[in-house]
Amino acid sequence: MEENSKSVLTESQVAAFNERGYLVADFSLNESMLDAIVEKVQPLYPEDYQQNPTLPARVQDAWKSIDEVRQLARDMSIAQALQQLVGRQSLPFQTLNFPIGTRQFTHSDTVHFNSIPSNYMAGVWVALEDIDEDNGPLLYYPGSHKLHEYSMHDFDLEPGYHNYHKYEECIQKVIER
């Protein structure tokens, strides 16, 4: 870790992350910034979503056009926490915004993007809507970060979106073992 890096997490938080593979942390993010993100991203959702908000929608890489998203992606406290957790400086490279929770099935983000060396990809999720256990929280399986990285090829599936649901089913079976 670099000498000028600051510890923002306790030793017990780091140990919990190493054991479970995820960490819930409060970085006291600026609420005005978060509200501005919601407001400024809203018009970027596709027209079909604007007409029917029950349809799934997302905006990828809003950090390229919205200052507040870029500010969040580069938040120093989050970057310092990531450095404590993985022992390397982080490089934010993608943002995904959703108007509401995505209702995704069990999956591994490494099928979408990865890192070299492997096992250094970390995702940061910031809820921009109020959530609780009844309305769509993010679900992690404790310890799943210690599993093998599975690609579609590992399940004899041809790569591509047409096999994504089958991939999710295979990942769910691995998790349930």
Residue spans of the language-model regions?
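Short beta-strand segments in beta-sandwich/barrel cores
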Residues: L23, D130, L138
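A structural signal for well-ordered alpha-helical scaffolds and beta->alpha junctions
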Residues: T10, D75, A79, M121, ...
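Non-heme Fe(II)-dependent double-stranded beta-helix
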Residues: M1-R20, V24-P117, H153
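Double-stranded beta-helix
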Residues: D134-R177
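Residues in well-ordered beta-strands of folded domains
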Residues: F93-P99, W125, L139-Y141
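Generic structural motif
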Residues: S32, L44, E129-I131, G143
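Short, structured patches in soluble enzyme cores that scaffold and shape functional sites
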Residues: S108-T110, V126-D130, P142
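Short, conserved beta-strand element in jelly-roll/cupin
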Residues: I116-E133
